[in-house]
Design a protein with these regions (language model features):
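Carbohydrate transferase catalytic cores enriched for Leloir-type hexosyltransferases
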Residues: 1-349
């Protein structure tokens, strides 16, 4: 039996890794061929996505980031009650990287990125220490490490010193039943769905928007994702957190997705936008170039003029970018990801 340990999940706090994990579980429930059991924390008793499950009441209830850290510390100090609950698993998978509880069975860890090592200046000393302790140690202890892109694989092998044969690339999928083209008219706005972390590069995007509006004064920029606390320039609309249905609607109505991030392990919004028929302009960082696969217009992330020029190119050639994007997005499915994960599990059985 394959155990999937989600004990460190606090719903709504883990961003893209939570969405990716739920997508994988849903696909395993639909098309999986192995027996599964999901081990859930009391804070997320419904996160099994249709697979058999146990809620481990021995794990401390956690509804916030601080409570999550406390629960993790207690589980690390006193792992035996949790280990007993997982003893029937032949292989244990930790989709949120941290091996809690540690077990004697072979383990698979999903490592979404190594941003704390690649861009350490963006993290506090405490956060760097936490990630180095739990992420690095968990990856080194696992029999297999799964990453979403070749970029993260190279970083993992280089920075953590792992044997390349232990690290497998399995790209994320998307729900094509939800992320699909609609009949909406395209409107004169650009979409950037990203929480306002420093590496998301909002300030440079604002500079590019000012340049764009000299030539296309009707253009607006719509932001989603939360975290926006500073004032924004004219032409910027801050939506904050939006529902999945609202996000799909925005993808279907936006003239283009613009994604100027300085760092990504995968870049899920790029694929989601393409699947909705939204043309994409994104930064030329390795993970986004890899994921876009030539179907997006790329630019240097810190060059406002280059961002503006890329957006104008996408707007002028929208039909071409739309078709290329739809073709590229079709290759990213959770069913394919689930099949590759099952290949990894079988290696350890």
């Amino acid at each position: 039996m394959i155990g999937i340990a989600l004990l460190t999940l606090v719903p709504g706090e883990l961003g893209g890794s939570e969405s990716a994990t739920r997508g994988l579980l849903q696909a395993l429930a639909r098309v999986g061929t192995l027996p599964y059991r999901v081990y859930l924390p009391p804070a997320a008793p419904d996160a099994h996505e249709g697979l058999p499950y146990d809620v481990l009441s021995d794990y401390r209830l956690a509804h916030s980031r601080l409570e999550r850290l406390l629960a993790l510390g207690l589980a690390t100090a006193r792992p035996e009650p949790l280990r007993r609950r997982l003893r029937s698993a032949d292989v244990v998978h930790y989709p949120f990287t941290i091996r809690v509880p540690s077990v004697e069975a072979p383990t698979v860890v999903t490592l979404h990125d190594l941003q704390h090592l690649d861009l350490p200046q963006l993290f506090s000393r405490a956060e760097r220490g936490f990630r180095s302790l739990y992420y690095n140690r968990s990856a080194r202890a696992a029999e297999r490490v799964v990453v979403p892109s070749a970029f993260v694989r190279a970083s993992t092998v280089d920075r953590l010193g792992l044997d390349a044969d232990r690290v497998r690339v399995i790209p994320h999928g998307i729900d094509h039943a939800r992320f699909s083209p609609g009949d909406d008219e395209r409107e004169p706005f650009l979409l950037y769905p990203a929480r306002a972390w420093p590496h998301k590069n909002h300030a440079r995007l604002y500079e590019a928007l000012a340049l764009l509006r000299r030539e296309r004064p009707e253009l607006r920029l719509v932001l989603t994702g939360g975290g926006q606390t500073e004032s924004v320039p004219d032409g910027v609309e801050v939506r904050g957190h939006v529902s999945l249905d609202e996000l799909v609607s925005l993808y279907r109505r936006a003239s283009a997705l613009v994604f100027p991030s300085r760092y990504e392990g995968f870049g899920q919004p790029v694929v989601e936008a393409m699947a909705c028929g939204c043309p994409v302009a994104c930064s030329d960082i390795p993970a986004l170039v890899e994921v876009a696969g030539g179907a997006a217009r790329t630019f240097a992330a810190d060059d406002a003029e280059a961002i503006a020029a890329a957006v104008l190119d996408v707007l002028a050639n929208a039909a071409d970018y739309r078709e290329r994007g739809l073709e590229r997005a079709a290759s990213f499915t959770w069913e394919r990801a689930a099949a590759h994960y099952e290949d990894v599990y079988r290696e350890l059985l």
